[in-house]
From Swiss-Prot:
Bifunctional serine/threonine kinase and phosphorylase involved in the regulation of the pyruvate, phosphate dikinase (PPDK) by catalyzing its phosphorylation/dephosphorylation. Belongs to the pyruvate, phosphate/water dikinase regulatory protein family. PDRP subfamily. One of its GO terms (molecular function) is phosphotransferase activity, phosphate group as acceptor. ADP binds at residues 148-155. Keywords: Kinase, Nucleotide-binding, Serine/threonine-protein kinase, Transferase. HAMAP family: PDRP. The keyword Transferase applies. This is Putative pyruvate, phosphate dikinase regulatory protein. It is an enzyme of class 2 (transferase). Its EC number is 2.7.11.32, 2.7.4.27.
Length: 270
């Protein structure tokens, strides 16, 4: 039984069937010769695989989501005396029976979900790497650039957009004593969003922040005159960039995120 040939047939990449076959074969003392046949779209290919499998006395294991293709392979393989094992079909049928929902019958759904997952991870890592202006090079690489003074929800908003919308977001804090990075004036203004907040609201938020850290709320950080100075600087920078401004004074992060996503979609940037 050494090098028993198994043809793995799929209407997508065939990774699912390959993994299942290897897991099953791992229970036996012989090494399987697994030959993958991916992206099968027609019965002609199935007929050819059956013929080859017959000549090699091989087993066919398959993941085909379309019922007509599954039935063709099972029927024709039986006629030729070839063993064909349906890995995913019975489970799809069982789930349909239990839930009453009709399957989509779309090949490659798992792979597309995997791709979406990795896009999300990439976006999250990007948000962490380019958070709080720690590397200005991220500004030119980002899908979205958030600009604002301290405590305008730049970081949580960046993470929300990464987690839920898979957008790569860089955020830039503005303080009067530090010139904004040059990249801020080089990036397309359509990618930039200024986060505006009223002085009173920011004063309250900063005082609460200081209290949570066990510090006096009388620090310069929460001083209303200092706050106004920062907001004036913010407005000066934003006027040069000429980007969209969102008042986040009384908005939840989800609401601000939706405004940004809608703006991006309207601009047809992606």
């Amino acid at each position: 039984m050494d090098n028993k040939i198994v043809y793995v047939v799929s209407d997508s990449v065939g990774e699912t069937a390959d993994l299942v076959v290897r897991a099953a074969m791992g229970q036996f003392p012989f090494a399987p010769d697994i030959r993958r046949v991916p992206y099968v779209e027609d019965t002609g290919t199935l007929k050819e695989v059956i013929s080859i499998a017959k000549s090699n006395q091989a087993l066919i294991c398959f993941t085909l989501v379309k019922p007509d293709m599954r039935q063709y392979l099972v029927t024709e393989a039986a006629k030729e005396g070839v063993e064909a094992y349906d890995i995913i079909g019975p489970l799809i049928d069982q789930i349909e029976e239990i839930t009453g929902q009709v399957p989509r019958y779309e090949p490659g759904v798992v792979r597309r979900l995997d791709e979406e997952y990795f896009k999300k991870i990439e976006a999250i890592e990007f948000a962490v790497k380019y958070d709080d202006g720690r590397d200005a090079r991220g500004i030119l690489k980002a899908d979205i650039v958030l600009i604002g003074v301290s405590r305008t929800s730049k970081t949580p908003l960046s993470q929300y957009l990464a987690h839920n919308k898979r957008l790569k977001v860089a955020n830039v804090p503005l303080v009067p004593e530090v010139d904004p990075p040059e990249e801020l004036y080089q990036v397309a203004k359509e990618k930039c969003f200024g986060l505006k907040i009223t002085p009173d609201k920011l004063n309250h938020i900063r005082k609460e922040r200081l209290k949570s850290l066990g510090l006096s709320d009388g620090a310069t950080y929460a001083n209303i005159n200092r706050i106004q100075e920062e907001i004036d600087h913010f407005e000066e920078v934003i006027s040069k960039i000429n980007c969209q401004v969102i008042d986040v004074s009384n908005k939840a992060i989800e609401e601000t995120a939706n405004i940004i996503v809608n703006a991006v979609q309207n601009q047809k940037m992606f």
